[in-house]
Amino acid sequence: MASRAIFVFPPFRLDAANEQLWRDSNRVDLRPKTFEVLLYLVQNAQRLVTKRELLDSVWAGASVSDELLRGYVRELRDALGDDAKKPRYIETVPTRGYRFLPRVNDESSVQTPPSELKPAKAPRELRVGILHSLTGTMASTESPVVDATLLAIEEINERGGILGREIQPVVIDGASDERAFARQAIALIAEAKVCAIFGCWTSASRKSVLPIVEQRDHLLIYPTQYEGMEQCSHIFYTGAAPNQQIIPAINWAVGFLRKKRFFLVGWNSIYSRAANAIIRDEVEASGGEIVGEEYVLPDSTEVTRVVRTIAQTEPDLIFNSLVGDMNLFYTRLLRAAGITPEKIPTVYFSVGEIELQSLSAREIVGDYAAWNYFQSLDRPENHAFVKRFRSRYGRHRVVADTMEAGYLGVHLWAQAAHATDPDDVAAIRRALPNQSFEGPGGRVRIDAENQHTWKTMRLGRIVEGGQFEVIWSSEKPIRPEPYPSSRSPTAWNEFLNKLHTAWGGNWTKSQSAISQLDDGHSAE
């Protein structure tokens, strides 16, 4: 059957050569990738097509989420007038794949529609990569960013794409492993031929992808708040720089809460080490004191010791830079030790609405988080964004800062692509500076000098229901400064290089390698 140019399952005719689907004499519009999914199912009519087989055929072996595939099947059912519960065309075989039910007739029985009814063939699609952790420790945190990124792509495609060309996402799993991120970035550029990569969360994953986009003259759009100390012409940063999150939070804790004694909790990553170095500089410059600085590993028994140390030192406030699932065990032990927000509050730098879904209200209500965006923001643009997201993914879903930053990154890139040749990665990089967008959290703009984004900073108090009450906001968007002013760029680069060397050339490391450092802050 694969050699046929025309496939018929009344009242539909599928013209493979011209990538057209007809219902009687009426053309049925399908996106290019949706057509490819249908074509493969039709070519293999009346037999089970596994998900893996379908993904390998249509996406050439690239890693694509099941949710994305289900979205294309839903589109097909809508176009065919099919019912998932009582299918006439596409049957879902739970956990296995799909079966195209109708018998497909020989092409000899087909009368091709008049040529005058055939529109011009649509221009080819624009492929973009989405590279986040869909498995491993970071999956629960990163997967929602994929959803927000896909939502932005869908919005742009609904408006005609980029110069009439549909954006086709290629979603790949970084597996919570910096080496996997590097391998997958190469695959996206060399094999999938994407014209941009949206992704990475941890600084370790970004640092692993950085030399790849540099060497291949490519483009990464990075959506996460981070420690700064970096400026790469091949990366555009839509998350917060330190002066847009960490430093204002310190100033607020010292100036508004009047706290003097601080405890720092992080994990064995470049982000936590660098963030805590920034905090130490700022706190000591203000006359405050760091009474403890500890780092934990995922699932580490060291968490119990860290909590015991916090109880013994009795700080005024804890700054927490743990990420992903690491906060679950730590927070429960903290509360079990009697350390509550009323006694010793915590300011989180990586806990947002997504993470709050995994923590019970009694464990976290009253603590604080520093971000640029909260779902609770009362802005028309935000209400519309939340409504669209929930309409697409379910009313139970929440949105968070990095999801909004991922969403912004797609729209900023699309504006730059519209303004130049969308296939020319270097031209898009030149067009991105000074692009601005009215996002859910306010107007943002890419700085022309450092490729970071002007953003409004906000502090939120955790309230019942897993949301935040905004208690402080900067008066206007803050210009990004990737290198904190407490040290020179050279000194910060030396700080990072010392960590990288101590960790055996990696950006995260096991506890045994951490012990090579003299103490919790000797890399300074």
Where are the predicted features?
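DNA-binding patch around the recognition helix
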Residues: A2-F7, D29, L41-Q46, V64-Q111
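A structural micro-motif at secondary-structure boundaries
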Residues: R4, R13-F35, N105, P113
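Short amphipathic alpha-helical recognition elements used for nucleic-acid or partner binding
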Residues: N26-V58
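Flexible coil/turn residues that form the inter-helical turn or adjacent wing/linker of helix-turn-helix
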Residues: R47, A62, D421
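Defense-system signaling and execution modules centered on TIR/cGAS-STING-like, death/scaffold domains
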Residues: L101-A122, S522
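Extracytosolic ligand-binding ectodomains
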Residues: K118-E524
